[in-house]
């Protein structure tokens, strides 16, 4: 009895061993995970279906001599029913045995497919030229409302002003922290630029006053010097020095001071105050 039980247990265990059953028409020739017991059951079903089909052909041949029309009508109906059952069984069997996505592709393959899909979607997106033009117009005409503009749009506008090829698609690949750092850098640059502009205007005014003083004394050759020394030349020659001077003096970025110095610079160049 003990030997019989051990043999039965061994046979049962063998029924649950996995087999390598594959189908050539299945994508990537993936294997079905079937046990020996399941494979034996499928073979038995195949034998039964083949036997029933053979018996049907024999019955049709035998009944042809007695009542051909009646047999054909009745047997055709049963044959269609039998075929329908067979098709339904095969379809349901295929559906149940279809492996999941995790079984077909590993994690690296799925990540690669997702990256390809994202790249294709980005190619289909419209270019940001219209947005860049609109932002440029809005930025230049409404400087007081710069705070409500999108940070990415401000970065694009700054890149456009400096003739740097940059699009919204390039910024979408950046993280929020990187966008924040670029925005802060641009904001700090504008603050320093405004402070440096105050020192530049003061230098232009001093040059105009000194020019008029020297012309009044008798140095006519110096006339027109203030027109030659433009803000661009000052920024190119001593721009960094003006920036350091503005920082050390603690010059504040005051719009009133900027406007006043700008107007004073224009009038001094046109009017002889000495």
Curated annotation (Swiss-Prot):
InterPro entries: Poxvirus_A11
Induction (free text): Expressed in the late phase of the viral replicative cycle.
Major subcellular location class: host cell
Residue ranges the record marks as coiled coil: 106-136
Pfam families given in the database record: Pox_A11 (PF05061)
Domain of life: Viruses
Subcellular location: Host cytoplasm
Hydrolase listed as a keyword: no
Keywords: Coiled coil, Host cytoplasm, Late protein, Phosphoprotein
Post-translational modification: Phosphorylated by a F10-independent mechanism.
GO cellular component: host cell cytoplasm
Family: Belongs to the poxviridae A11 family.
Subunit structure: Homomultimer. Interacts with A32.
Task performed by this protein: Required for viral crescent formation early during virus morphogenesis.
Protein name: Protein A11 homolog
Organism, scientific name: Fowlpox virus (strain NVSL)
